[in-house]
């Protein structure tokens, strides 16, 4: 089994990546392979509402020239998907939102192709707005008919400067619990 995570942060090794790696630690202990895809510095644009995904139904977005179709392929190949983002004005980063919108339309156009995969949101935040960002990701998972594991708290880590989340003991523990629960859920799905 495999989990792919998409880091929507502009900081490759910032708080969001630290939180994802805390989840990955537990997944790896359970024998689940992991892959982290950094959206930072990659070309990615929003949905153009062209509707071609519904016309062609080929598991691909018609917009070319960026990484979205590569990301969709990785999502299809994985058993679990983590979408991770810092909080930008009480929501996910624009790069992650573009991935959600475009992969979401492609999934709907192709018989909910992410159906019954495990999905988990991971949010880094300085102070406020994390719940809305968390909800944005979970709305994508739920409309895609994915299965979402819980944790001991919302999947949020607190910190401003890169590395600050390492001092949020409860946030790191929440990520570890999420990883253990995601591993358990994925094994149950595949029994």
Predicted regions mapped to residue ranges:
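N-terminal beta1-alpha1-beta2 submodule of the flavodoxin-like/Rossmannoid cofactor-binding fold
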Residues: 1-109, 159-191
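Short, glycine-/small-residue-rich phosphate/pyrophosphate-handling segment
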Residues: 94-95, 109-155, 173
